[in-house]
Swiss-Prot record:
Record organism: Porphyromonas gingivalis (strain ATCC BAA-308 / W83)
Protein name (Swiss-Prot/TrEMBL): Major fimbrium subunit FimA type-4
Main subcellular location of this protein, as a coarse class: other
Propeptide: 19-45
This protein's encoding gene: fimA
Gene Ontology CC entries for this record: cell outer membrane; pilus
Species lineage: Bacteria, Pseudomonadati, Bacteroidota, Bacteroidia, Bacteroidales
Keywords: Cell outer membrane, Fimbrium, Lipoprotein, Membrane, Palmitate, Signal, Virulence
Record GO biological process: cell adhesion
Compartments, as annotated in UniProt: Fimbrium; Cell outer membrane
Length: 388
């Protein structure tokens, strides 16, 4: 009889640990309420004007009372998650709803501080718009016994309708940097010597922050880790000081096309503290006026002038969202310059007026052969114009 009893208890325990495929294992909290909510994601605009970056295919929602996780639920939908329904939780005041989308974190049982301390690193997978992490956090609100609905339209049947008509905002952790277009209009003094073909060129992030936080007013991490898409001679912007790391990330390099670019993470440029700028660069062969590779003695002359390296490659670097170099800006630059901010798309229009440089990680003359216009919009897009 005892064996039968223990066997039945074991089956009951197994049944209690089983969970719905849409749910994390729930915290051990006595529940008397549920929370459902609608989300609002940012404007649908990706680096290549692809809309897939706005899609949420996995969303984890957590309910917190102070540091205690009182409820958690994960929903996965290939077609996109727009809401999460019926999160079991406990009623009470000063509850906070925290969400993380498109992630691979283990979140069950984590305190609020632990979740808000999570970080992410820039990887090749991030250049696929489907793998962009998004986060959101509500203001404190009261959960009442029964059904609670957050962000649903007014008139929704509910025991407690919170933030009626205003869904929970969920925003991307990443930012976008891209070339909206590159034109070549060689100035008079160069027309008889040089040309450049963007269609045959490549683009790369010369300097990009490797990691960031996923929550907070600023996501800039306190690490000094950076990535590059193509190796160039060291310069003033190169992360080579003590304590800094600078690693190759091949996904930060691709062929030039209108709208081509990369997803990057928040960063801040501060020369006094050796915080590096984010640099987007187009590079390729510096050609003669007829569009042919340079030959001697023209190649040596161009190398000596600092226009290209030994194999004739010239670089046109742009410091993204930099306040200087004669860059022209338009759009919603509401969060300042000399930094990369989450959920912003920095679209750079480039007008090449002369040869580039062989030291793209060094400061360039203000009157360099580059006109830059940058637009910032909320996805947010920043349009930046540069002239070389």
């Amino acid at each position: 009889m005892k064996k039968t009893k223990f066997f039945l208890l074991g089956l009951a325990a197994l049944a209690m640990t089983a969970c719905n495929k849409d749910n994390e294992a729930e915290p051990v909290v006595e529940t008397n309420a549920t929370v459902s909510f609608i989300i609002k994601s940012g404007e649908s605009r990706a680096v290549g004007d692809d809309l897939t970056d706005a899609k949420i295919t996995k969303l984890t929602a957590m309910v917190y009372a102070g540091q205690v996780q009182e409820g958690i639920k994960t929903v996965e939908e290939d077609g996109g998650v727009l809401k999460v329904e019926g999160i079991p939780c406990k009623s009470g005041a000063n509850r906070v709803l925290v969400v993380v989308a498109n992630h691979n974190y283990e979140l069950t049982g984590k305190s609020l501080n632990e979740v808000e301390a999570l970080t992410t690193s820039l990887t090749a997978e991030n250049q696929n718009a489907k793998n962009l992490i998004m986060t959101g956090k509500s203001a404190a609100f009261t959960i009442k016994p029964g059904s609670n609905h957050y962000g649903y339209p007014g008139g929704t049947a509910s025991d407690n309708l919170v933030s009626a008509g205003t869904p929970l905002a969920v925003t991307r952790v990443h930012a976008g940097i891209s070339f909206a277009g590159v034109e070549v209009n060689m100035a008079t003094q160069y027309q008889n010597y040089y040309s450049f073909k963007p269609a045959d060129a490549k683009i790369a992030a010369l300097v990009a922050k490797k990691d960031s936080k996923i929550f907070g007013n600023s996501l800039v991490s306190n690490t000094n880790a950076y990535l590059y898409g193509v190796q160039t001679p060291a310069g003033l912007y190169t992360p080579d000081a003590a304590g800094e790391t600078y690693e190759l990330e091949a996904s930060l390099n691709t062929n030039y096309a209108v709208g081509a670019g990369f997803y990057v993470l928040e960063s801040k440029y501060d020369a006094s503290n050796e915080l590096r700028p984010t640099i987007l660069c187009i590079y390729g062969k510096l050609l003669d006026k007829d569009g042919n590779p340079l030959t001697e003695p023209a190649l040596t002359d161009a190398i000596n002038a600092g226009f290209c390296d030994g194999d004739g490659t010239t670089y046109y670097p742009v410091l993204v969202n930099y306040d200087g170099n004669g860059y022209i800006y338009s759009g919603a630059i509401t969060q300042g310059q000399n930094k990369i901010v989450r959920n912003n798309h920095y679209k750079i229009s480039l007008n090449i007026t002369g040869p580039g440089t062989n030291t793209p990680e060094n400061p360039q003359p203000v009157q360099a052969n580059l006109n830059v216009t940058c637009q910032v919009t909320p996805w947010v897009v920043v349009n930046q114009a540069a002239t070389w």
